[in-house]
């Protein structure tokens, strides 16, 4: 009797996320510009774009824009708070071929914060 052994390949999850401070208030309100930035970030990071959705929220100090790109590998998200000149960025990918840090760096270069934090989490199964 012949036995077949199935080899499991690891799930490669890479999560890059951070906070951006001191970003231009008008840029953080510009829904179309933010959408274009997210789409270009997906291309730069070698991700396969499935769909992009965005929402503009109004209401005092809680106004802002959220842009979420569903990519074949997972997602890219930007959430903004213009009143605070603040944004959060989240880039998560599965697979070895995409580069979430490249997407994050591109987004930071386009939003030009006065300062930012970046975090990396290896979310791989071993």
Curated annotation (Swiss-Prot):
Q: Name one GO cellular component term.
A: cytosol
Q: Quote the cofactor binding remark.
A: Binds 1 pyruvoyl group covalently per subunit.
| PTM per Swiss-Prot/TrEMBL | Is synthesized initially as an inactive proenzyme. Formation of the active enzyme involves a self-maturation process in which the active site pyruvoyl group is generated from an internal serine residue via an autocatalytic post-translational modification. Two non-identical subunits are generated from the proenzyme in this reaction, and the pyruvate is formed at the N-terminus of the alpha chain, which is derived from the carboxyl end of the proenzyme.
What is this enzyme's class at the first EC digit?
lyase
Which GO biological-process labels does this protein carry?
arginine catabolic process; polyamine biosynthetic process
- Record GO terms (molecular function): arginine decarboxylase activity
Name the UniProt key words of this record, in alphabetical order.
Answer: Autocatalytic cleavage, Decarboxylase, Lyase, Polyamine biosynthesis, Pyruvate, Schiff base, Zymogen
* EC numbers, comma separated: 4.1.1.19
The pathway noted for it is: Amine and polyamine biosynthesis; agmatine biosynthesis; agmatine from L-arginine: step 1/1
- Name the SUPFAM superfamilies on file: S-adenosylmethionine decarboxylase (SSF56276)
Positions marked as site (Cleavage (non-hydrolytic)): 73-74
Reaction equation(s) it catalyzes = L-arginine + H(+) = agmatine + CO2
Q: Which domain of life is it from?
A: Archaea
| One protein family per Pfam | AdoMet_dc
Query: Where does the record place the catalytic residues?
Result: 74, 79, 94
Pyruvic acid (Ser) occurs at which residues?
74
Q: Name what cofactor the protein needs.
A: pyruvate
Please report which protein family the annotation says this sequence is part of. Answer: Belongs to the prokaryotic AdoMetDC family. Type 1 subfamily.
Q: Subunit comment for this entry?
A: Heterooctamer of four alpha and four beta chains arranged as a tetramer of alpha/beta heterodimers.
State the function annotated in the UniProt record: Specifically catalyzes the decarboxylation of L-arginine to agmatine. Has no S-adenosylmethionine decarboxylase (AdoMetDC) activity.
Any idea what this protein is called?
Arginine decarboxylase proenzyme
